[in-house]
């Protein structure tokens, strides 16, 4: 079973392009777009580890939401932000996707897949939130956390 229910987190972190910030704040929600879930990390340490294994690996292959083989493009930290969000309570919609691996895989691969699976958590549907903060990605990748409060349209 690839999906397992997860407890409701008190806060989550979401990597997105800066160009998306205005519409996210207008909506007061993270939209799932072409996937069944929208994805988050439960801590900045998990976010950094997740980024190091995904978006920071230019050219690394991955499977997109539709099962299409893709490759990570060059990551531009100045074009992205990390949003720290307080989810509005949505019982039962949080899931963890356990990385699928072939039967009889070497123990090292099993361990790597299990560790990767713990880095992210999915929310089924669009996630409404409150108390948003925007974290500068370039500074974050250099070890500094520079954040600012941002307000949704309904909070203004």
Where do the model's predicted regions map?
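Short helix/loop capping segments that flank catalytic or ligand/cofactor-binding pockets
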Residues: 23, 48-50, 94
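Short, charged/polar surface micro-motifs in flexible loops or helix N-caps
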Residues: 18, 44-47, 88-92
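A generic structural motif
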Residues: 36-42, 110-115
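Segments that shape or occlude catalytic/ligand-binding pockets
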Residues: 32, 47, 107-108
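ADP-ribose/NAD+-binding catalytic cleft of ART/PARP-like enzymes
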Residues: 1-39, 52-55
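Hydrophobic beta-strand residues in large extracellular and virion-surface proteins
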Residues: 12-13, 24, 37-43, 81-85, ...
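Active-site and NAD+-binding cores of ADP-ribose-processing enzymes
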Residues: 58-156
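Short active-site loop/helix that positions an aromatic residue
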Residues: 44-61
């Amino acid at each position: 079973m690839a999906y397992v229910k997860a407890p409701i987190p008190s806060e989550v972190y979401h990597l997105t392009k800066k160009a998306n910030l205005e519409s996210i704040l207008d909506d007061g929600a993270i939209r799932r777009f072409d996937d069944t879930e929208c994805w988050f990390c439960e801590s900045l340490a998990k976010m950094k580890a997740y980024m190091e294994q995904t978006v920071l690996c230019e050219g690394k292959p991955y499977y997109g939401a539709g099962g299409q083989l893709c490759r990570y493009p060059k990551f531009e930290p100045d074009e992205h932000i990390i949003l720290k969000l307080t989810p509005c309570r949505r019982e039962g919609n949080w899931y963890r996707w356990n990385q699928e691996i072939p039967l009889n895989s070497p123990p090292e691969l099993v361990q790597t897949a299990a560790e990767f699976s713990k880095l992210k958590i999915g929310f089924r549907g669009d996630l409404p939130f409150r108390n948003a903060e925007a974290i500068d990605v370039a500074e974050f990748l250099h070890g500094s956390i520079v954040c600012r409060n941002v307000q949704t349209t309904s909070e203004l």
